[in-house]
Structures are given as C-alpha cells and as structure tokens.
C-alpha cells in the first residue's frame, strides 16, 4: 500500500476521482484470466483484499464496494505521487540554481506500468497495456521539442544504449541487447530495421498473494497475442490454459478477446510464427521445463 508524506494526509479529501471506463467491466478475455490477479472487487481468486486494508465493509454490494475501494486507493496513490512531484521540483530547482539545467537530461521512468482499477485490477504483472507499458518522460529542451511524442516500440533494454549515446558514446557495446532510440527524441524517421513487435513473459505463476497466472505473449504495433500456460516451471498449481488476442486499434482497452474470430485467423497465425521465432532467439524455449513444453505443444493450435 502507498505511504504518503504526512503533509498530504488530506490531499484530495473532498474530490471525486474520475473512474476508468472499464472499472466495472473485467475483460472477457478467457477462462485463464477471468477472476485471477489482485483487484478491487470481491470476485477475485486472490486472498489479498484491498477493501479490507482500506477499512471498507464487505457487506456492500459489489458495485458500491468497488467504487469505495477505487476512491480510497487512488487518493492514497495520488498523495504518494504528490510527494514524489515535490522532490522532482527540488531537483529541477537545484539544477536551475547551479546553472546546470540546460546541461542535464532528466528521464522519468519505471520498471513497468501499474493498474489503478482498470479491468478491476491493481498491481502489475499482466501483459495488458496498463501494466505492460512503461512511463518514459524526458526533459531535454536542447534535444527534444516540448510536448512531442512518438510511436516507436521501445524496450527497457534500450534505455542503457540511449543514455550512453546521450553521454557521448558513439557505439553501443556488443554485449548489450538494446538499441539507442535517440533518433526518436530528434523526430527522425523510425529506422527501417526497427523492431515491429516486442515479447513479454510473466513466469512467477500465482506467486505471493496476488495470484497472477503465468503467461507470455507478443505485442505488435496493432495487435497483441497472449498464451496463458498457467503453471510453475516445475509444473505445479495448474490453472486454465488459454489464448487471448486483441486488436489494439479497435479495442485499446483490451475488452474483447478476438482469438476465435475467423476474421483475425491469418494475423494470429503470423503472430504465432513470430512469437515462436522470438522465443527461440531469446533462448526462451523452456528446454529445462518439459512440463511447460508439453502444455505449449498441446495447445499451440487450439
């Protein structure tokens, strides 16, 4: 749970925080994902109850319970973030005072995204967009047009090569997997050989009290394909196995699993081939885990 600076204990106390559109619409994804993970509602498999920690009565109906959870949860989060903002300001003020602001690149990022009620979920771990996407905000007026953005597919393995190039290194060391995306800062065209998809895996099956099933998948510029294999590396604690597929252009909130839609079958087959190739390139073939290999083989064409 978030712990804020005491000076913000009453911040936003009388404010109603707007709710995400899909707060009351858990994804119709698949039997492998429905009800799993940690969330705001009472229907999740996870024993961890946010409402209990926030002092919310479980005698409320589901909708009232979730609404109350959301308001208290978001206010705790935003109170904590308010303190972080204060310290970012302190840093910027110091750089101004020392005359180094224009000689400094400030990067604000994280190791993953985070659910704040979307899909009736909290925490991270899932391949869904709110968790999968990472914040990456850069202040460098000498390099970047303010308020600009770009659509390059970037991985966190690209962070180090980019920072090294910003520091003056001309060539990324061969032992690094990532690539510099400094060209994106300068509004250069995306290189023709830039990646068109990215891979994700969550292997800590049903770990801790958060109960997120193991899965892997691939996200292209428009589509996302996910395979829930649902077990530990040793094959224990099996949960349902299923595929999910989303058209992120038509369904950016990932509410409709189109895996069985005939319209998308050729796209799905192409993504499966790409997913298989990427897993091979990354040595993610589960050779040491034959139980997982059997699940993949049995369900690859299902």
Predicted features along the sequence, with ranges:
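Inter-blade boundary loops/turns of WD-repeat beta-propellers
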Residues: 139, 248-250
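Mature extracytoplasmic/periplasmic domains
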Residues: 261-264, 287-293
């Amino acid at each position: 749970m978030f712990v804020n600076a005491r000076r913000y204990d009453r911040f936003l106390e009388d404010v109603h925080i707007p709710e995400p559109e899909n707060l009351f619409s858990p994804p119709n994804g698949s039997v492998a994902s429905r009800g799993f993970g940690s969330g705001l509602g009472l229907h999740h498999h996870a024993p961890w109850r946010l409402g209990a920690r926030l002092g919310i009565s479980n005698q409320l109906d589901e909708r009232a319970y979730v609404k109350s959870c959301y308001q208290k949860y978001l206010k705790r989060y935003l109170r904590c973030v308010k303190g972080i903002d204060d310290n970012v300001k302190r840093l910027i003020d110091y750089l101004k005072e020392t005359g180094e602001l224009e000689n400094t690149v400030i990067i604000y990022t994280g190791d993953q995204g985070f659910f704040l009620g979307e899909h009736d979920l909290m925490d991270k771990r899932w391949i869904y967009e709110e968790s999968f996407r990472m914040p990456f905000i850069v202040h460098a007026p000498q390099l970047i047009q303010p308020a600009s953005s770009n659509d390059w597919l970037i991985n966190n393995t690209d962070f180090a090569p980019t920072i090294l190039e910003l520091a003056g290194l001309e060539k990324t060391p061969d032992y690094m997997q990532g690539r510099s995306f400094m060209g994106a800062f300068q509004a250069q065209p995306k290189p023709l050989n830039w990646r068109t998809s990215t891979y994700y895996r969550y292997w800590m099956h049903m770990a801790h009290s958060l109960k997120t099933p193991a899965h892997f998948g691939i996200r292209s510029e428009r589509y996302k394909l996910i395979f829930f294999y649902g077990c530990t590396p040793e094959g224990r604690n099996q949960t349902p196995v299923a595929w999910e597929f989303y058209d992120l252009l038509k369904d950016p909130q990932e509410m409709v699993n189109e895996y069985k839609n005939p319209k998308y079958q050729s796209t799905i087959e192409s993504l499966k081939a790409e997913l298989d190739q990427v897993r091979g390139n990354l040595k993610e073939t589960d050779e040491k885990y034959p139980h997982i290999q059997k699940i993949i083989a049995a369900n690859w064409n299902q």
